[in-house]
UniProtKB/Swiss-Prot annotation:
Keywords: Ribonucleoprotein, Ribosomal protein. GO terms for molecular function: structural constituent of ribosome; tRNA binding. The keyword Ribonucleoprotein applies. Belongs to the universal ribosomal protein uS10 family. InterPro entries: Ribosomal_uS10, Ribosomal_uS10_CS, Ribosomal_uS10_dom, Ribosomal_uS10_dom_sf. This is Small ribosomal subunit protein uS10. One of its GO terms (biological process) is translation. The gene is rpsJ. SMART domains: Ribosomal_S10. The keyword Ribosomal protein applies. Part of the 30S ribosomal subunit. It comes from Pediococcus pentosaceus (strain ATCC 25745 / CCUG 21536 / LMG 10740 / 183-1w). NCBIfam families: PRK00596.1 (NF001861), rpsJ_bact (TIGR01049). Involved in the binding of tRNA to the ribosomes. It holds the Pfam family Ribosomal_S10.
Length: 102
């Protein structure tokens, strides 16, 4: 495999789980002899929902809820076949969304 790059994007609502998953991926890739760039923290997406706190009246009384989506980016440069196999077998928590591009 000459000059290939695997780009892994991780998304999660909790940053602790996200960082643990990124550390697992980096450790696995380093153990197999690949060169790694990252984890790079990307901007956090913040979605705010405003709802009325009373069912009928009192329009001024409102509550705001927010969801934060944390993101990380990991680049694996010159991956070996062993790296790809070990990444496929890696078990990550269910709260982490993974996108892999070759």
């Amino acid at each position: 495999m000459a000059k290939q790059k695997i780009r892994i994007r991780l998304k999660a609502y909790e940053h602790r789980i996200l960082d643990q998953s990124a550390d697992k991926i980096v450790e696995t890739a380093k153990r197999t002899g690949a060169t790694i760039s990252g984890p790079i923290p990307l901007p956090t997406e913040r979605t705010v929902y405003t709802v009325l706190s009373s069912p009928h009246k009192f329009k001024k009384a409102r509550e705001q809820f927010e969801m934060r989506t944390h993101k990380r980016l990991i680049d694996i440069v010159n991956p070996t076949p062993k790296t790809v196999d070990s990444l496929m077998k890696l078990d990550l928590p269910s709260g982490v969304d993974i996108e892999i591009k070759l």
